[in-house]
Amino acid sequence: QLVADDVKLSGMGDISRGLEGRSAGVSVQNVSGTFGTAPKIRVRGATSIYGDSKPLWVVDGVIMEDVQDISAEDLSSGDATTLIGSAIAGLNPEDIESFNILKDGSATSIYGARAMAGVIVVTTKKGRPGVSRVNYTGEFTYRMIPSYSNFNLMNSQDQMSVYQEMAYKGWLGNSRVTNASASGIYGKMYALINSGAMQQGSAEQVAFLQAAERRNTDWFKELFQPTVMHSHSVSITSGTEKSSYYASVSALFDPGWTKQSEVARYTANLNASYKISDALSFNMITNGSYRKQ
């Protein structure tokens, strides 16, 4: 059993990603950083004669069906349907109390053949007798644009100097480059020469190569943006010997580290119980979420 506070990672809206390295025999691979995509989780091995090897998610006794049935192998396909591949992406991490990972025969004895790949049981918070509390949790995560200085990469001038050396040694001749599947800047140059738009050895050719040498496009700035992801959660809990309840609302806003990848998620949760007698009690659990992505 895992306590949610030990699993939770700051700046991570989907708490299932925090299971990585938390339980022996459970393999968790985050194949994508995009919100809503499910991590690849293996509880009972990588293969199964029954086909699917994804574990079954159970929240407060309710089996969470996938909105889109995606196999573990297809999670890294990049298809848009993977954005709704996580069964619990709509849960507020602040509402979760614990995880219990079932790996052995107890999983199939309770949940049947669907649990052949293991079961992850999620227990949410409940009201407690004699406890009344209002709680607010806010998280702010700042992401910076990556810098080329953090990587051992050539700039445009370094790259062109390598190309020029290869050209002098005959590796980037017209016949070699023209027939290549990927030919880069020299392929574009020879295409212009072969079409008659540029003369071999002309000043125009020199200017063409010099322009490429000074280009230095910062692709990190083209693809990424500095952003602040923030989430807010308000919960109310109260209880007596007869009844108790826990209610919460939350909102998560992520402008997206990569451009055009913003996410907004809203959740609401109510867990109420009423003790009618020593032998009979009534429990109501409701949970809803809305996500725009």
Question: Each PLM stretch: what is its role?
Answer:
Residues 1-269, 274-291:
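Short, small/polar-rich motifs associated with maturation and membrane association
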